[in-house]
Amino acid sequence: MKNLIEVLMLTFNEPLYLFLLVIFPLIIYFNHFLKNRGGKIKFPISLYGNFNSLKLKDYRLNLMYFFTYSFLYLAAMVMVFALAGPSVSKKKMIHLSAGADIVIVLDISPSMGAVEFSSKNRLEFSKELIRGFISQRENDNIGLVAFAKDASIVVPITTDREFFNKKLDDIYIMDLGNGSALGLGISIALSHLKHSEALKRSIVVLTDGVVNSDEIXKDQVINLAQGLNVKIYSIGIGSSEEFSVEFKLRSGKFYQGSFKEVYDPSMLVEISNKTGGLFYSVNDDFSFQFAIQDFSKKENLERKIKIAVDNKDIYKEFLVLAFCLLLVYFIFSKIFLKEIL
């Protein structure tokens, strides 16, 4: 994936000429605001129609006089900018290196309702860390697979973070039944990485390690991942303790109770080790965040950026603008004000 960022900048080849601009406030003050100067100057004026004999008040005369000469001052200032040699620089930053393709496999079985992380259940805390994880990997395509008794692709690999987060928020425990088919979830993730052309392809599994309804053996998963050169990183969430369980179903029904599991991460360890990934055992907030951060470091791609700069001189445009301003000045001074220079 190539990202293109364009930046436009206005630069000057001879910037010292810009110091001439400081004299214009002095000229304007001397001609129009200094006592007994421009504010008191009399000049002939005539109006069209039946108003030729109408005598305007001094302040209206002075206002029209200043308004007319403002075009002359603007024209002169634009000429100074033209002398300074203005140019537009278009800087293009092209990311040549492609991002990684990552599929997150998320357990949404009932045991993920165990409350042990900052008063949140395992699923809600996992969602929170996933959001932080994807926000740090701007150039990566990231997908999401959820599994329980069944498994399903929730988000195809994409760079659309808003869409990803929306679908992530819409996941509920037991959406896919009461069970834990880890092998099926990983197999679906692998099928979506099969035709990926990314330099790095990996899967991140977040589960409490309880597998009780799987139709796909771990050896099948390992062989498929090895054949596709996909690394599988596993984050085992849990321990062999009793936890309170709190979660809400999509229907709005709320479950609350206790849960004791037999935590056995051996399957996760074997899958990760044989596919070139790593296994992380998580039992508190700190270790959970460390696992995500460590994965980000190991699967980080070195970014190659090409910078192309295109300069275009625009002094001619400034001269045209100055000419137009002078033309307006002469129209006002010669036709509307009937001033004789």
UniProtKB/Swiss-Prot annotation:
- Domain (VWFA): residue spans on this chain: 101-305
- Keyword Secreted among record annotations: no
According to UniProt, the name of this protein is: Uncharacterized protein BB_0173
Task: Classify the protein's membrane topology as the record does.
Answer: Multi-pass membrane protein
PROSITE patterns, from UniProt? VWFA (PS50234)
Q: Which Gene3D superfamilies match?
A: von Willebrand factor, type A domain (3.40.50.410)
Key word Endoplasmic reticulum present in the record?
no
Kindly list the places in or outside the cell where this protein is found, as annotated in its UniProt entry: Cell membrane
Annotated InterPro entries: UPF0353/GerABKA_families, vWA_BatA_type, VWF_A, vWFA_dom_sf
Mainly resides where? membrane
Query: CDD domains recorded for this chain?
Result: vWA_BatA_type
Output the Gene Ontology cellular-component terms: plasma membrane
Keywords assigned by UniProt, alphabetized: Cell membrane, Membrane, Transmembrane, Transmembrane helix
Q: Where are the transmembrane segments?
A: 8-28, 63-83, 171-191, 317-337
Recorded hits in Pfam families, A to Z, give:
VWA
